[in-house]
């Protein structure tokens, strides 16, 4: 039976800054579990599989089953159900909150964070399996049980038409279909296995033009595997790393996720690396193409892309650029004396790869560059220490649920979820009853702050300061992020106001000052904050975005979410430390407020870039303005935002926004105008903060009624449609949102609407 392990090492090749706090990984133990436990797991798996085309999102039941066995669960309070004609009472809300918090406290890990699924994208696991296959480490790193669960996952998320999507809820794409078909083959499935599902997958690929129509990232992965030719790829010259930094196209000016993926890709392209040609690879050459492999027109293939994948079509300037590099520049760099420059570029690339690996304890900024960097380390030296240090960190990215084993979009969302959870629990005003939960969470926040900058000359490595920041996941990961720092700071400041007898010692003021320093340092000239770094180049750089599948990836843009979180954190900080860098804090807040107001859409909404979508963005937009004292009575911006939200409320009382809003940039309801507990909570939080209760409480009562009725028998909330997004077009799971935000919204509703009403 599988067991989730928390904050453990277990390998001499693991490095850590904080004794592995926040680390989460799954391990198989054949001796674990009673017959009843095993039956419960199998029932969860069967239920998911039977309903997989209706409910594509797993509910994280294996983790929940484990915690229900391990943690003492208090008797569940009676479930509350409210008729449409009934009034919502304070007692009903308090009972719902206690039921929700009683449950949520049972799935907290002993180190204080809430583990959970951060899967969703369907292109991550293939990169891992291709890399492990090439390096010969597949059977060393993954047990038979790992491989079995991965196959389960891939079959569970195959669409009815036989293909696979970019993410678990997406329609079939060539990128998803080819890579996941290849992954199943590398995991031991034959071309006709899976009760006909392999054949269905292959038919989808061939009926849509074959693997020559895969996206550029897919072409790269197939090329290193040996199932595609490098001449069928557009150039990714590593020489770009040798350009002077003042050029706007220097990779050091790009969004860190973009440059950190193209860094190892350029190394592999520069070397034209191809793995061992095995019998499976030779067979794939026959299975994936509509013509014999030796007859494929690789030059034509460079610019082919299936229409199903084309979110960001290449502009003409890009086609001209790639053709020039391919036909003129590359031939020069492949032979003497140009080869000397190529060798220098490759050395520069691997130097930067090692720096990234060492300063993330071999976790790396994300799963794509994690496996690419690992492959590059092996290509450089198959027996290297660097490659061995990479291997145990693979498990940090693997998550198991009833749908199988997936690769996550990060090594988790530990700090992010914990920061929100703390704010949600404090909003209920039930602090004393849940003191032990808050104390553990407080400890996690304190242990997860990044305490040092990366070593060396940060400019040389194109890195921003880190000291004082909070990361998205763990301190070992260590990349600083603006909104994670802000949410960590908000949580720390709120807890510092609670008696230390309940939540433990407050964080040292010096560390709070360092967090404020990070936030201020990340503000751009326009007042907005981007994610990891300052915006270092221009939006026109998207003209050379080679990734057909993703939008707005080349530079780090300022976002309403990051900017609003910074305002809220700095306002909270200023109340407690009014004298610290007063002028800079005031100016930062003022500029950020102007930025948020300037990017509001004409309909009153804000586009959310990191979750679905206008509901999420508008919650942040409103909260940023509310933090400086604006309400729907004194601010036309807030009033317009409230009008927008109220116009989207469903007859059920809730809100339900589809992920299609993200890619189309137009508000879309969920199918059948269904409501969603997370969207509903975001809308409620925005409206309550804006002062809706002073104007008309009815929409809030209706929303609260929907949330209360949605709560499950055990106090959990249901897992509904996917709610996270990145790069406009790819969805990602935030498993904790279904618990955090309904609790937060009902907490604020109880304290700021019902209790105020009673006074």
From Swiss-Prot:
This is Cycloartenol synthase. It catalyses: (S)-2,3-epoxysqualene = cycloartenol. GO terms for molecular function: cycloartenol synthase activity. Expressed in roots, stems, leaves, inflorescences and siliques. The keyword Isomerase applies. Keywords: Isomerase, Repeat. Changing residue 477 to N: Produces 88% lanosterol and 12% parkeol instead of cycloartenol. Produces 75% lanosterol and 24% 9beta-delta7-lanosterol instead of cycloartenol. PFTB repeats lie at residues 147-188, 512-557, 589-629, 638-679, 700-741.
């Amino acid at each position: 039976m599988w067991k989730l392990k928390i904050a453990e090492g277990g390998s001499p090749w693991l490095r850590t800054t904080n004794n592995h706090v926040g680390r989460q990984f799954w391990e198989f133990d054949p001796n674990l579990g009673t017959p009843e436990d095993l039956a419960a797991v199998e029932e969860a798996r069967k239920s998911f599989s039977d309903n997989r085309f209706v409910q594509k999102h797993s509910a994280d039941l294996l983790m929940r089953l484990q915690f229900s066995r391990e943690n003492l669960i208090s008797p569940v309070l009676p479930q509350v159900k409210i008729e449409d004609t009934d009034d919502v009472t304070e007692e009903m809300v308090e009972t719902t909150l206690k039921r929700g918090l009683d449950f949520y406290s049972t799935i907290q890990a002993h180190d204080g964070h809430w583990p959970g699924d951060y899967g969703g994208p369907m292109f991550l696991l293939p990169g891992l399996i291709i890399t492990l296959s090439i390096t010969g480490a597949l059977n060393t790193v993954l047990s038979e049980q790992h491989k079995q669960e991965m196959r389960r996952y891939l079959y569970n998320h195959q669409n009815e038409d036989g293909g696979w999507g970019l993410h678990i809820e997406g329609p079939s794409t060539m990128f998803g279909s080819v890579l996941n078909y290849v992954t199943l083959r590398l995991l031991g499935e034959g071309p006709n296995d899976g009760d006909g599902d392999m054949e269905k997958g292959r038919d989808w690929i061939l009926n849509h033009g074959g693997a020559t129509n895969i996206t550029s990232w897919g072409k790269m992965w197939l090329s290193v595997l040996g199932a595609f030719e490098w001449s069928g790829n557009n150039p990714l010259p590593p020489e770009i790393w040798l350009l002077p930094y003042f050029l706007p196209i220097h990779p050091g000016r790009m969004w860190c996720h973009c440059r950190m993926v193209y860094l190892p890709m350029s190394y592999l392209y520069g070397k034209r690396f191809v793995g061992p040609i095995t019998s499976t690879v030779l067979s794939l050459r026959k299975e994936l193409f509509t013509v014999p492999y030796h007859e494929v027109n690789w030059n034509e293939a460079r610019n082919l892309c299936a229409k199903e994948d084309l979110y960001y079509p290449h502009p003409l300037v890009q086609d001209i650029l790639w053709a020039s590099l391919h036909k003129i520049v590359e031939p020069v760099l492949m032979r003497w004396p140009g080869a000397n420059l190529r060798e220098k570029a490759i050395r520069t690339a691997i130097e930067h790869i090692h720096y990234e690996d060492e300063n993330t304890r071999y976790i790396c900024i994300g799963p794509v560059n994690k496996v690419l960097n690992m492959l590059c380390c092996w290509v450089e030296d198959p027996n290297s220490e660097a490659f061995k240090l990479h291997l145990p960190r693979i498990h940090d990215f693997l998550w198991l649920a009833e749908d199988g084993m997936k690769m996550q979009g990060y090594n988790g969302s530990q700090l992010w979820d914990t920061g929100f959870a703390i704010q949600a629990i404090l909003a209920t005003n039930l602090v004393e009853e849940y003191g032990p939960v808050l104390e553990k969470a407080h400890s996690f926040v304190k242990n997860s702050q990044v305490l040092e900058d990366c070593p060396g000359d940060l400019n040389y490595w194109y890195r921003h300061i880190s000291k004082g920041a909070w990361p998205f996941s763990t301190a070992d990961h260590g990349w600083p992020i603006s909104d994670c720092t802000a949410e960590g700071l908000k949580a720390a400041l709120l807890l510092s106001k609670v008696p230390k007898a309940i939540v433990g010692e407050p964080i040292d003021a010096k560390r709070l000052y360092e967090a404020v320093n990070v936030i201020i340092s990340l503000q751009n000239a326009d007042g907005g904050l981007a994610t990891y770094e300052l915006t270092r180049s221009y939006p026109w750089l998207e003209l050379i975005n080679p990734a057909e599948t993703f939008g707005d990836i080349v530079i780090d843009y300022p976002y309403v979410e990051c900017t609003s979180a910074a305002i809220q954190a700095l306002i909270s900080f200023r109340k407690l430390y009014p004298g610290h860098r007063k002028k800079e804090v005031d100016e930062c807040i003022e500029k950020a407020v102007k930025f948020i107001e300037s990017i509001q859409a004409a309909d009153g909404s804000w586009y959310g870039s990191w979750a679905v979508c206008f509901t999420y963005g508008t919650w942040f937009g409103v909260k940023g303005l509310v933090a400086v004292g604006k309400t729907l009575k004194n601010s036309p911006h807030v009033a317009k935002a409230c009008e927008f939200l109220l116009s989207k409320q469903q007859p059920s009382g809730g809100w339900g926004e589809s992920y299609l809003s993200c890619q189309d940039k137009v508000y879309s309801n969920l199918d059948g105008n269904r409501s969603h507990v997370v969207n509903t909570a975001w809308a409620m939080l925005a409206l309550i903060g804006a002062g809706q209760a002073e104007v008309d409480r009815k929409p809030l009562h209706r929303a609260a009624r929907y949330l209360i009725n949605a709560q499950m028998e055990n106090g959990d909330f249901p897992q509904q449609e996917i709610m996270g997004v990145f790069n406009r077009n790819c969805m990602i799971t935030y498993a904790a949102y279904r618990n955090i935000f309904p609790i937060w919204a009902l907490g604020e509703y109880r304290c700021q609407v019902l209790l105020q009403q009673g006074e």
